[in-house]
Amino acid sequence: MFLKGKTALITGSTSGIGAGYAKALAAEGAAVMINGFGDAGEIESLRQELESLSGAKAAYSNADMTRPEEIRQMCADCAEQLGSVDILINNAGIQFVAPVDEFPEDKWNAVMDIILGSAFHATKAVVPGMKEKGWGRIINTGSMHSK
């Protein structure tokens, strides 16, 4: 198991590709903290699946990715519960589809807060620990689609 002894924090990981990242990292032995929203039972099932894949602990944070203080607390909780964050995958995102000339500014701001804001705040929170250890990986994901 390539990542045994490492801890990964993945935002936007209670379903979809984020859950896929979590499973892949757990299968390589990483302890994983997932984050997102959804059905509590499904999230708990995913958390248990991650533990069975890795043999390491898995945890869940319901931090709101638009709130910097919750993002900082999520990163601190991950370090406290699972060990310092070695791998951060900034995967949280939302989408709203409209032609640019019809795109509401409030929707644009919400998209940017989640995608860029959460990546900035999570990265800022974990980098000091990575520097202290002399090891860390940060992966920023995104997707786009067009009409």
Model-derived segments and their meaning:
Residues 28-45:
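Conserved glycine-rich Rossmann-like NAD(P)H-binding loop of the short-chain dehydrogenase/reductase
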Residues 91-96:
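Conserved NAD(P)H cofactor-binding loop of Rossmann-fold oxidoreductase domains
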Residues 123-124:
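A short, exposed helix-loop element centered on a Lys and neighboring polar residues
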Residues 99-100, 104-112:
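Substrate-binding pocket helix/loop in short-chain dehydrogenase/reductase
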Residues 7, 14-16:
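Conserved glycine-rich cofactor-binding loop
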Residues 139-147:
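Catalytic loop of short-chain dehydrogenase/reductase
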Residues 40, 61-74, 105:
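The beta1-alpha1 cofactor-binding region of Rossmann-like NAD(H)/NADP(H)-dependent oxidoreductases
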